[in-house]
Amino acid sequence: MSRRGTAEEKTTKSDPIYRNRLVNMLVNRILKHGKKSLAYQIIYRAVKKIQQKTETNPLSVLRQAMRGVTPDIAVKARRVGGSTHQVPLEIGSTQGKALAIRWLLGASRKRPGRNMAFKLSSELVDAAKGSGDAIRKKEETHRMAEANRAFAHFR
């Protein structure tokens, strides 16, 4: 282990148009093969589609969707005495946001549809309303944590 000290936590930058960190986090997660300009195009088209669908501020829809999908608790596999237990752990806000973004993008990639911008906008609108695959994934994780509450002392 290094004796030089701890690395400071990186802060995410905000995107150029909306000046929003959440949008930039989405861009960085949707990015494939280093094509960041394409990732920005996809996100901005999705935001425009949200604006057209809901006729409200698209960033508030995005925030509401993130709030709905972000988990409070997660399960982690822990090996104890030859058997593996799913141990429920509380997670911080940063890790929760990262999980929520991953689930939203995964759910939107699985959706049938024309292009990624359309699928992402549909998933975000559904998540803001309280439905969709990403919300289902969060509820499933919470159910798993509740079912394995007996193993909480294995942390």
Swiss-Prot record:
Member of which family?
Belongs to the universal ribosomal protein uS7 family.
Q: Is DNA damage among this UniProt entry's keywords?
A: no
Q: Where in the cell is it found?
A: Plastid, Chloroplast
Q: Which gene encodes it?
A: rps7-A
Single Gene Ontology BP annotation: translation
This chain's protein is named Small ribosomal subunit protein uS7cz/uS7cy
Keyword RNA-binding on this protein? yes
A GO MF label: rRNA binding
Q: Can you tell which superkingdom this protein's organism belongs to?
A: Eukaryota
Q: Which GO terms describe its cellular component?
A: chloroplast; small ribosomal subunit
SUPFAM superfamilies per UniProt: Ribosomal protein S7 (SSF47973)
Q: Pfam families of this UniProt entry?
A: Ribosomal_S7 (PF00177)
Q: How does it assemble?
A: Part of the 30S ribosomal subunit.
